[in-house]
Amino acid sequence: MQIALLCEDLNRQSELEAIATRWGLTHDEDNVFALVLTTQQLELRKRDEPKLGAIFVDLVSGAVAHRRKFGGGKGQSIAKAVGLNKGATPLVLDGTAGLGRDAFVLASLGCKVQMVERHPVVAALLDDGLSRAKHDADIGGWVSQRMSLLHASSHDALEQLMAQDDFVQPDVVYLDPMYPHPENKKKSALVKKEMRVFQSLVGADNDADALLAPALLMATKRVVVKRPDYAEWLDNQKPSMAIETKKNRFDVYVNAGMKS
């Protein structure tokens, strides 16, 4: 994929080149999107809209850290959806990892989470944020033990993983496909910015429905699909149950009991 590759710390130029090689990125000077390696982090900028600021993965501070400390623990909806409230600590595969926020919440509650992100730029951002979190004195130990990013950034990532001899099937597959956002629905400024940038970078998630069938084959216990409250069921399949929040719901497709 082509994108502008910029390094603001001359001592890290070789790191940027390694990132480009790892994720199949080539430099395009005129691209409206820039992947920028600063002294602190890897970030994405939309060059024609500088006021939007940069997007980067921060699992150590800010909103993610606040949610880890004060977000409700195993009583929160996402925890119930994956079965944490049933005394189990499932192995979770997050098939649409994005910036890693939901995966981080599940990992902070004890789950081992394998993350898959198919878009190479988003995967590069997530990989950088994960690396920084692993080196953090406070959370680095359990992040290193519980969170991993799988190199599967194509449309049939789930099928590819199932074909690998050493792949361990997860108890739960978690999906949060990007969904068109109606103008009349309120979102935070940060989420609006990220959605706007991602939807123009990644494009519409038109094949999201195709994720459900392989996810159901992969998960030994259940598939959890996060949807906006106004969205239809994924692939028009009715879930076994739904857990609703103010703005979203978690559609749960049960393959087996959590303790079976």
Swiss-Prot record:
EC number: 2.1.1.242
Compartments it resides in: Cytoplasm
Keyword S-adenosyl-L-methionine: yes
Keywords of this entry: Cytoplasm, Methyltransferase, rRNA processing, S-adenosyl-L-methionine, Transferase
GO molecular function: rRNA (guanine-N2-)-methyltransferase activity
Binding-site positions, S-adenosyl-L-methionine: 101-102, 117-118, 153-154, 176
Keyword Membrane appears in the UniProt entry: no
Domain of life: Bacteria
Any Pfam family: SAM_MT
InterPro entries, per the entry: 16SrRNA_methylTrfase_J, SAM-dependent_MTases_sf
GO cellular component terms listed in the entry, alphabetical order: cytoplasm
Top class in the EC scheme: transferase
Catalytic activity annotation: guanosine(1516) in 16S rRNA + S-adenosyl-L-methionine = N(2)-methylguanosine(1516) in 16S rRNA + S-adenosyl-L-homocysteine + H(+)
Family, as annotated: Belongs to the methyltransferase superfamily. RsmJ family.
PANTHER family cross-referenced by the UniProt entry: RIBOSOMAL RNA SMALL SUBUNIT METHYLTRANSFERASE J
Role description: Specifically methylates the guanosine in position 1516 of 16S rRNA.
Protein name (record): Ribosomal RNA small subunit methyltransferase J
Species whose genome carries this gene: Aliivibrio salmonicida (strain LFI1238) (Vibrio salmonicida (strain LFI1238))
Highest classification ranks of the organism: Bacteria, Pseudomonadati, Pseudomonadota, Gammaproteobacteria, Vibrionales
